[in-house]
Amino acid sequence: MAVASWAQAGALTQKDASKQGEAVRKWFLSALAMNMMKAQALTAWQVSEEQRDWLRLLADRVQIYATPRRQRMDLYNNHDYWSSWAVMAAGLVLDEPARLSWAEQGYWLAIGQITPRNGGVVLPREAARGKRAEEYHAFAITPLILMAEAGTRNGLPLYEGDGQQLHALAAQVVHFWAQDGKGVSFAQRQVAIDDHKMAWWPVYAHRFPERLPLPAGDADRFGSRFTGGSLAGLWQATP
């Protein structure tokens, strides 16, 4: 099994990583932890102690890099959302509540960035991305929905209170994906959003089918490499 050899080698745990290396590390941790969650939920597989140590070190590295960025809200963007989710996912696999608390703090910082604009809502850092603004909104909301869902299943009511703003953002992103012209529009012609950037949608639609039902077809088409593939079957039971 590849994960065993990666753990033995301590893959991606080096201290001195470039900015791009740090980005890759958090995305890798997200996909890795989510695949571990799927394996634990759907098979008899269990994480070994060596793999736990490796996962713990990866999460530590992500937190060390991401924590200072929370003091710079002018920089805080989708990268930070993904860092928070990656650490939360690792915390769920490791059963380490402190990591969930750290991730929750990052979640609320992100929720605070949701801003009304022209009949819809935007994330200002992502709205500044020119022709890819809509695409980046789809990418950015994915870790937020995953944190809200995982948090809800673990005693953190992240869809409630200010978290209700996530519903407006989800609706706006679906409008972007559908190219229906509703809500916010940008001056520059936008790149179409590929289905794999909508990996969050099956999770959200399962909990809130009356809000944003999935279009007819195979929900697996919304799988993403950043989430370890499709999430359509991971959280089917609503607590």
Question: Where is each model-derived feature located?
Answer:
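Acidic/histidine-enriched alpha-helical segments
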Residues: G163-H167
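Short, hydrophobic secondary-structure boundary micro-motifs
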Residues: K15, E160, S185-F186
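Terminal, non-catalytic domain-edge segments
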Residues: L146, A150, N154, A168-Q172, ...
